[in-house]
């Protein structure tokens, strides 16, 4: 069935949404304001899903600078939008999430971008020899990925991936543990294969510098989900002390190595589940930093942080929806002092959000 419709707004994942037979109809690769023809391939009781067939009236914000084949690949959800439209989509999404989920009005929001809008990823998982059409098992052969750093190349003949970075090296031991090393703000980080490290170094650096601005020399800081110690070690010079808590053993080993290698004395890493640590902890912390997974903070963790009563909570999130939901639980005791979004993943619908909460002065 072919439908004609006008795209009215965007879904959370950047799909265009119009209405056909009074049902919301989701179409990938279209822009708000465009009039299109689309083939409806899925019908439910409450919505349609459709595939773009023809653009009848095109938006001025459509991106024509990329080969059409790339639009079909999964992971490039916003590639058809120019940068102005991508920025507008992401800012609107953050503002709408906080309004709908937390009943909080963000009057003004900045979205920070790096210089690279393509070829910004220093790590990518690929299927050797080809990529796949979005939401399918059909393979497409492409000469390159538009998001991968141009220094990351494939040797097809020998089926090996080779990392070529002047400031990065690969290390190994007899136990075949493999690490990469990277440098940020003068601090060297060892990163194991099972440890997390941000894939867009330029934007990550902007975020960490911003976090550092909220740390004072007289503060004891608790860094939850501290990973390999990236935030803990980068803010150490600004704090009285930093305690990092992480349950992943490989990450803790990397964090302790990084602390010793960089000769940083005022940081302590603890290998423990965050909930268990907070339940046993008797130490007061002025500032708590959280950088949870996409699911956000569990309710038990929020309650334990509230009992700790830190003056500041610095919340870095890769999922604005769960960040807004968590703020809903904090807002009776804390107010938003600062919020800013970061375009960690251009050409995709993902957003990194930094929020700083300040304790309310109740009398």
UniProtKB/Swiss-Prot annotation:
Residues annotated to bind S-adenosyl-L-methionine: 198, 225, 246, 291
Keywords for this protein: Methyltransferase, S-adenosyl-L-methionine, Transferase
Highest rank taxon of the organism: Bacteria
Cross-referenced InterPro entries: MeTrfase_TrmA_AS, NA-bd_OB-fold, SAM-dependent_MTases_sf, U5_MeTrfase_fam
Broad EC category: transferase
Residues of the active site: 318
GO biological process, one term: rRNA base methylation
Pfam families membership: tRNA_U5-meth_tr (PF05958)
EC number: 2.1.1.-
CDD domains referenced in this protein's UniProt entry, alphabetically: AdoMet_MTases
Keyword 4Fe-4S attributed: no
GO molecular function terms listed in the Swiss-Prot or TrEMBL record: rRNA (uridine-C5-)-methyltransferase activity
PROSITE patterns, per the entry: SAM_MT_RNA_M5U, TRMA_1
Family: Belongs to the class I-like SAM-binding methyltransferase superfamily. RNA M5U methyltransferase family.
Protein name: Uncharacterized RNA methyltransferase MMOB5020
Organism from which the protein derives: Mycoplasma mobile (strain ATCC 43663 / 163K / NCTC 11711)
